[in-house]
Regions:
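N-terminal presequence-like segments and the immediate start of the first folded domain
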Residues: 1-57, 61-74, 80-159
């Protein structure tokens, strides 16, 4: 299985996402929208930040359950309601997600399907073929473009 983050040098570079992700071989896991709910199904208190953090933790638990980590995620889709801002969601989510620059779509929506939910995150994950171990997803920067090194401060969020 090969997962290649595609970031042409002629396009904006961001350490938190890739412009595209190419998946060769393997299997795909589609993770449905995860809201910020606890183990009993109740929405975590505190608003967008805690909900985003919990949604990421749930994604990571699913990834661990199938034997991979965030580096195997080919694409994320993040939904947040009109009642919160991207800043409310992004910081807490990135703290838990880390710098795994996958392809991402972020949508502000009127509302989510569950009352009280203000954040939802979905993922498409590249899994190794059955019976084969997970491979290293890192390819030379000459193949996929570059993103700023992790030690650089993150760029401001787009407005």
């Amino acid at each position: 299985m090969t997962l290649t983050h595609v970031n042409p040098s002629t396009m904006h570079q961001n350490p938190y996402f890739s412009q595209a992700t190419l998946v060769d071989g393997g299997r795909l896991l589609f993770i449905g929208e995860q809201n910020g709910v606890d183990a009993s199904g109740e929405i975590v208190p505190g608003g967008a930040g805690p909900q985003a953090a919990q949604a990421v933790e749930q994604l990571k638990a699913i990834l661990a359950d199938v034997g991979v980590d965030t580096s195997a995620v080919a694409k994320l889709t993040v939904y947040y309601s009109k009642d919160v801002t991207l800043d409310d969601v992004f910081g807490p989510a990135i703290e838990r997600w880390g710098r795994q620059p996958t392809a991402i779509t972020v949508l502000q929506v009127y509302a989510l399907g569950r009352e009280g939910a203000v954040v939802g995150i979905e993922a498409v994950v590249s899994l190794p073929p059955l019976g084969q171990p997970e491979e290293d997803h890192t390819l030379p920067s000459s193949v996929v473009g570059t993103a700023p090194p992790p030690q650089q401060p993150a760029p401001p969020l787009p407005k």
